[in-house]
């Protein structure tokens, strides 16, 4: 029984990433589906759908993934820290960008506080419906 995201690159070839399902079938990330997600998807997915494109820089994609996870953690008691974030730049051929994010991580705390504050701020700036 397996459900995972698997990706990487063989030297001289394009990089790729796959989502593998328990039945053995898989899907590959494409231009139309520039990211893959496993686990609880309903809370953080709208953020990914609105931000991530094929052209999104890797650092912005990582930030978006963490904001998505923060939203999921906020809305689902069964999801929590720690988080493992591995960023694998094209043609790097090694894993130098691994973060294990726990309750003490200052960057994740900042994301949590800033995202919540700014979301409430923009919500209050949108006009109420006219009846």
For each feature predicted by the language model, list its residue ranges.
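N-terminal nucleophile
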Residues: 1-131
């Amino acid at each position: 029984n397996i459900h995972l995201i698997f990706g990487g690159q063989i030297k001289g070839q394009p990089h790729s990433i796959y989502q593998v399902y328990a039945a053995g079938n898989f899907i590959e990330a494409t231009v139309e589906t520039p990211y893959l997600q496993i686990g609880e998807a309903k809370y953080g997915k709208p953020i990914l759908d609105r931000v991530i494109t094929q052209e999104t820089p890797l650092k912005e994609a990582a930030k978006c993934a963490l904001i998505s996870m923060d939203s999921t953690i906020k809305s689902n008691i069964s999801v929590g820290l720690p988080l493992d974030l591995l960023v694998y730049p094209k043609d790097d051929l090694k894993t130098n960008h691994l973060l294990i994010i726990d309750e003490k991580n200052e960057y994740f705390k900042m994301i949590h506080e800033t995202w919540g504050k700014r979301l409430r701020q923009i919500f209050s700036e949108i006009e109420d419906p006219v009846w």
